[in-house]
Amino acid sequence: MSVLLVGVSHRTAPVPVLERVAVTDTDRPKLTDKLLASSHISEAMIVSTCNRVEIYAVVDAFHGALAEVGELLADHSGLDLTDLHRHAYVRYSEAAAEHLFAVASGLDSMVIGEQQILGQIRTAYASSDAQQAAGRTLHELAQQALRVGKRVHSETGIDSAGASVVSVALDRAAGIVGAGGLTGRTAVVVGAGSMGGLSVAHLTRAGIGRIVVVNRTRERAEHLADTARSNGVAAEALELAELPDAMAQADVLVTCTGAVGAVVTLADTHRALAQPGRDSERPLVICDLGLPRDVEPAVSGLPGVTVLDMESLQRDPAAGAAASDADAARTIVAAELANYLAGQRLAEVTPTVTALRQRAADVVEAELMRLDSRLPGLDDPERDEVARTVRRVVDKLLHAPTVRVKQLASAPGGDSYAAALRELFELSPGSVEAVAKPTELGGADLGAIDITDGFIAGQDPRLRRFVADDNRGKESQA
C-alpha cells in the first residue's frame, strides 16, 4: 500500500478553477466517504485551503486509484477530466510524502513561510481521523508532516516576517484606505473561523480603531470580539443579517466564510454605501479570502470600492521568507524525509524478520519434540540445557542476518533484501504482514514507467496527463 496525492493549487490553477474544486467543511466528510467507497482506496485525507485542494489516499493500485480520484474530483467540481488534468498534479509514494512535508513547512504556500497551513493540515488530519479514514499509513504521514512543519518554523527564520495571506491582503488594504493606513479605522471581519481569528489578530497589531465581527452565530462572533477587546480594541459582535449595517461603518472588510454563494452581495454593498452619514468619498476595501469567493463579482465595479481577492493576490504575491531561510527549511525537509522513509522501509521489513524468527522457534520446538521421542530417558535439567543450547545457536545464527537486513532495508531499494529473505526461508505470504506493491504496477519501480512527458502509456487519454512531468514536479516544490 502506498500514498497517492492528487492536487490542485495556486501554482497550477487560476482562482476560478480553485473555486470549482474547493472542498468546504460540509463537503469534506461526503467526499471522504466516496473515496473510501472506491475499490482501490483504504485511507483518505483531504487538505483544503484558500489556495489548494489535495487528496491523499492510501492505495493498492496506482492506475486504478488515480482514475477513481480523478473521476471523483471531476464530479465534485463539475469540471471535465480534460479540463481538470491541465491543472492537477500527481505525486506518489515518496514524492507524496516529500510534497506534504514541504507544504507543512510553508515552502509551497503563496506566501512562503506562512504558518496557517499547519493548522489546516491538522484540521484535515483530525477530520480524517474522526471518520476513521486514517489508518497506520496516514497517521504516520500526517503526524510526521506536522512535526516537520513545527521543526522548520522553530529552527529557521522562515516565518520571521509573520507573513500570511491575511497579512498581505491587509497590508495592501492599508495602502489604499489613505494616510495613516489602518490606524484608528473601522474593520468588519466576516466569519469567525481561523481566518477570522488571524484577521482580528493582524488588525489589532496594525492599530485598528474598531472591529465588528459578523458571523452566522453571534456566540462565535462574540468570542472573537472578546479577543479584540482584551487587546484594547473596541469590538462588537453581529449576526450575518446585520452585515449591511456593519459595512456602512467600515473602511476595510475581510471575509472568508467557506460558504457556497455570495455573502457580500451587490445589493447589500450598494445599500451600505448609501447609508446616511457615510462620506461618498470614503473608500471601502474588501479583502475576499474565501474559496469559493464570498463577494459577488459586480461589487468590484462600485465607485470607491476595491476588492482584493485571491486572484489579485496571486498575480502579485508577497516575497515571504528570505532565500536563506527557505534553503534552511528545505534542508530540514530533506533530512526529515530521509528519516521518515527509512522508518517506513524498516517497518515493511520488520514483519519478515518476525516471521523468520517465529519459523526458527517452530523448528526448534519440533526438533525438541523429536528429541523427547528418541531419548525419553532425558531428565528435565538435561532437556532444559539442550533446549537452551539449541535456542542460543539459532539466535546467534539469525542475529547477524536479521540485523543486517534491517540496515539494508532502511536504504532506498532495500525492500529487495526483505523479499530475498522471504524467498530463501520460504516464508509464506500468510505469515508475513509485508506491505504489498500496487498490483497494477506489478511490483515495478515507478522509474520504469515513462512519465517524462506527463503521460502513462495505456491509460484513458483523459487521465494520462494527471501524472506530472519531472519539471512540473520540481516547480511545485520550489
From Swiss-Prot:
<comment type="similarity">
    <text>Belongs to the glutamyl-tRNA reductase family.</text>
</comment>
<comment type="subunit">
    <text>Homodimer.</text>
</comment>
<protein>
    <recommendedName>
        <fullName>Glutamyl-tRNA reductase</fullName>
        <ecNumber>1.2.1.70</ecNumber>
    </recommendedName>
</protein>
<dbReference type="Pfam" id="PF05201">
    <property type="entry name" value="GlutR_N"/>
</dbReference>
<feature type="site" description="Important for activity">
    <location>
        <position position="99"/>
    </location>
</feature>
<dbReference type="InterPro" id="IPR036291">
    <property type="entry name" value="NAD(P)-bd_dom_sf"/>
</dbReference>
<keyword id="KW-0627">Porphyrin biosynthesis</keyword>
<dbReference type="Pfam" id="PF00745">
    <property type="entry name" value="GlutR_dimer"/>
</dbReference>
<feature type="active site" description="Nucleophile">
    <location>
        <position position="50"/>
    </location>
</feature>
<dbReference type="InterPro" id="IPR036343">
    <property type="entry name" value="GluRdtase_N_sf"/>
</dbReference>
<dbReference type="GO" id="GO:0008883">
    <property type="term" value="F:glutamyl-tRNA reductase activity"/>
</dbReference>
<comment type="pathway">
    <text>Porphyrin-containing compound metabolism; protoporphyrin-IX biosynthesis; 5-aminolevulinate from L-glutamyl-tRNA(Glu): step 1/2.</text>
</comment>
<dbReference type="InterPro" id="IPR000343">
    <property type="entry name" value="4pyrrol_synth_GluRdtase"/>
</dbReference>
<dbReference type="Pfam" id="PF01488">
    <property type="entry name" value="Shikimate_DH"/>
</dbReference>
<feature type="binding site">
    <location>
        <begin position="49"/>
        <end position="52"/>
    </location>
    <ligand>
        <name>substrate</name>
    </ligand>
</feature>
<keyword id="KW-0560">Oxidoreductase</keyword>
<feature type="binding site">
    <location>
        <position position="109"/>
    </location>
    <ligand>
        <name>substrate</name>
    </ligand>
</feature>
<feature type="binding site">
    <location>
        <position position="120"/>
    </location>
    <ligand>
        <name>substrate</name>
    </ligand>
</feature>
<keyword id="KW-0521">NADP</keyword>
<dbReference type="InterPro" id="IPR015895">
    <property type="entry name" value="4pyrrol_synth_GluRdtase_N"/>
</dbReference>
<feature type="binding site">
    <location>
        <begin position="114"/>
        <end position="116"/>
    </location>
    <ligand>
        <name>substrate</name>
    </ligand>
</feature>
<dbReference type="GO" id="GO:0019353">
    <property type="term" value="P:protoporphyrinogen IX biosynthetic process from glutamate"/>
</dbReference>
<dbReference type="InterPro" id="IPR018214">
    <property type="entry name" value="GluRdtase_CS"/>
</dbReference>
<feature type="binding site">
    <location>
        <begin position="191"/>
        <end position="196"/>
    </location>
    <ligand>
        <name>NADP(+)</name>
    </ligand>
</feature>
<dbReference type="InterPro" id="IPR015896">
    <property type="entry name" value="4pyrrol_synth_GluRdtase_dimer"/>
</dbReference>
<dbReference type="InterPro" id="IPR006151">
    <property type="entry name" value="Shikm_DH/Glu-tRNA_Rdtase"/>
</dbReference>
<dbReference type="InterPro" id="IPR036453">
    <property type="entry name" value="GluRdtase_dimer_dom_sf"/>
</dbReference>
<comment type="function">
    <text>Catalyzes the NADPH-dependent reduction of glutamyl-tRNA(Glu) to glutamate 1-semialdehyde (GSA).</text>
</comment>
<dbReference type="GO" id="GO:0050661">
    <property type="term" value="F:NADP binding"/>
</dbReference>
